A protein has these predicted regions:
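Aromatic-enriched
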Residues: 218-256
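Short, intrinsically disordered, charge-balanced linker/junction segments flanking boundaries
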Residues: 259-265
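Generic preference for hydrophobic/aromatic residues in regular secondary structure cores
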Residues: 96, 255-258
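Thiamine diphosphate
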Residues: 3-226
Length: 265
């Protein structure tokens, strides 16, 4: 209702439901005349998918300062895939919050941190383990906006998918579990450029974002995907920052047309 001006705590102002719906329906989000943006990969001098995510995390830590922390398992040893190594190398060791092996606690800690006015980035180490944090994600984080009128600026990174030979619980594709929840923003970047842009933008949203990273795309095999392909790109890091500084949407909610045609497969 329009009378809702505070969240569940009185510490932070929250947008009204009307303001939020107006932002979602804003004409600057979706354009029916989007230009064709073909995918371009480079053999040298580009970033892998993992490198783009690492750089985005460092840039987010630099931008948000003390308001940003990174919460998850094995954080002190850079996580299961070394994704936190760039944060450590950039001097952000103190922002890494190591948690017990309990996804519910990890997500709830992120929610509490977000409600206090910070912008946490949470990691669920493998997709299958998101099931153990399902209640915290769906019945708590996702409901804060529409049930209590609260902001919950939290990004949840989730490595998922096959190509690790890690067995059950480590290869689940979980996007369908959460895609229909109206309180969650679900992102699944497919290229280094998309990964950088979407993670930067996600960190500026006032709602919980599930950021799904396919492990096979990381570039762990000599810079190539788990299928032996090169998807490395020279990543433009300026455009998304320009958009968020102006309060504009950059990629979230917009479709990229990468090839011409009449059918979607």
């Amino acid at each position: 209702p329009s009378t809702v001006t505070k969240g569940v705590t009185s510490l932070q102002d929250a947008r009204t439901h009307s303001d939020h719906l107006e932002a979602i329906a804003s004409s600057n989000i979706v354009s029916s005349t989007a230009p064709i943006k073909p995918l371009n990969y480079v053999e040298s001098g580009g970033w892998t998918y993992a490198r783009a995510i690492q750089q985005a995390m460092v840039d987010i830590a630099n931008m948000h300062g003390d308001d940003c922390v990174f919460i998850g398992e094995d954080m002190e040893v850079a996580g299961a895939f070394g994704m936190n190594m760039a944060l450590k190398n950039a001097g952000h060791q103190e922002k890494l919050v190591d948690m017990p092996l309990c996804e519910a606690i990890i997500v709830h800690t992120g929610v509490g941190t977000a409600l206090s006015g910070m912008r946490p980035m949470v990691e669920i180490q493998f997709g299958g383990f998101a099931a153990l944090g399902f209640n915290a994600l769906v019945n708590n984080a996702a409901m804060l906006r529409w049930r209590w009128g609260a902001d919950c600026p939290m990004t949840i990174r989730v490595p998922l998918g096959a190509q690790t030979r890690s067995g059950p619980f480590h290869a689940n594709m979980i996007e369908s579990w959460f895609a229909n929840d109206p309180g969650l923003v679900v992102l699944a970047p497919g290229t280094p450029q998309d990964a950088y842009d979407l993670l930067i933008e996600a960190a500026h949203l006032d709602d919980p974002v599930l950021f799904l990273e396919h492990i096979g795309l990381y570039g762990l095999r000599g810079g190539k995907t788990g299928w032996g392909q090169n998807i490395n790109q020279k990543v433009d890091t300026k455009s998304v920052h320009s958009s968020v500084e102006k309060g504009e949407r950059h990629s979230i909610g917009k479709a990229s047309i990468i090839r011409e045609g009449d059918d979607v497969t």
